[in-house]
Amino acid sequence: MYDCIFCKIINKELPSYKVYEDDLVLAFLDINPLTVGHTLVIPKEHSESLLNMDDKFNERVLKVCKKISNALKRINSSIYGGINIYSALGAGAGQEVFHTHFHVIPRFKNDGFGFKRGNKLNLEVEKFKELSMQISMNI
């Protein structure tokens, strides 16, 4: 058994504000939301990140993210412009709970949350070619 807060929620050892559950996936409201309606979607089987999650969960987790997104848009007409869906993979990317999870974050006008793009890297064409080849060869 993992000493994992999300596993404890799955096993009903800790409470949650559940919005969806099926045999593979659980979705519940984030108790430290970035915006109103911020929801977490998790596989019921423990894995530390998307990179080592069993493939049988991939399709289901994304389908549930879509269901939650559509539900949020139906119940809140003030959602402005869209919804962010993301997963941080590793501490360097901001992952704090090491159980695979996706954030479904409704966006509101002037909500103060967002991904800010920094300076452009200004890579040369050859560097783009080299990088695309390296990635392709490692898939």
Curated annotation (Swiss-Prot):
Residues 5-114 form the HIT domain. One of its GO terms (molecular function) is catalytic activity. Gene3D superfamilies: HIT-like. A motif (Histidine triad motif) lies at residues 99-103. Pfam families: HIT. Coiled coil: none annotated. GO terms for biological process: nucleotide metabolic process. PANTHER family: ADENOSINE 5'-MONOPHOSPHORAMIDASE HNT1, HIT FAMILY PROTEIN 1. This is Uncharacterized HIT-like protein BB_0379.
